[in-house]
Amino acid sequence: MWFRQLALFRLPPDARPDLAKLEAGMEQHCFAPPSGLEWSSQGFVAPAGHAPDRLLHPLAGGALATLKREDKVLPAAVIRDVLESKVADIEAREARPVGRKEKRELKEQITDDLLPRAMTKTSRTRALLDVHAGWIMVDAAGQKAESMVSALREALPPFPARLPHTQLSPGSAMTGWLAGEVPDGFELDCDCELKSPGDDGATVRCSKQDLTAPEVRQHLDTGKVVTRLGLVWQERIRFVLTEQLELKRLQFLDVLEEQASQAGDDAPALFDATATLMLGELRHLVADLIAALGGEAER
């Protein structure tokens, strides 16, 4: 249930989505398995097993959404083996070579024949919609995070979520924190990554180290900048901040898990308590992090 990473998207104050309308739109984009000749498909599914009819699981000041994707897996080696067998059979029966164009057509035919019977790989991407504070927080990175926002946009256009921009770039801020003091509420953890400027610059990765040690700080003296930095927020959440303002290796510490467990042994109650607690904690963490980066920059 607990998110393991975080990609942030900003919702403008004057364009916070109506969750009821959004859920109605999501119902038009429910997940369905890929058909015979489709390579993949995606769509929304219920985030909570105990509420199978809800595509948006309501939380205090927000909701939880889940996007399911299914990709067919058809290894190139399988297609190649079948193709080689067919080519050999044709050449033996008809006593002629099989040309390049015919091989290409055979390959397409083989792919179409095998695709409906191919194995599938399933993935799920979850997002917290914090309409109270105006954030979409996705438990993914890169293209997967963008796919979630795009799917929400299709469900309720125009859904103007965008990447956030801060007064201080995460890279310059993290470099300053490693060289001096971290902002109130945060403390250095034990991992970081530093790079020399330029595309071909050297990279140094420190893991499970005291980041205040001279041998770590001396990399800053040679001109390297911090691209990833391990931080702990309020002794409650551990994470690695990246220069793209993504939170990796997100870990909710024992104090939060104990709070959630007080909801009891009932699975639905524990799910709701965990999701609500996670939304509230991430809401405050993101607010403190954006403030530590100088606040949001006007666009």
Language-model-derived ranges and their functions:
Residues 1-135, 139-299:
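Intrinsically disordered, low-complexity, charge-rich terminal extensions
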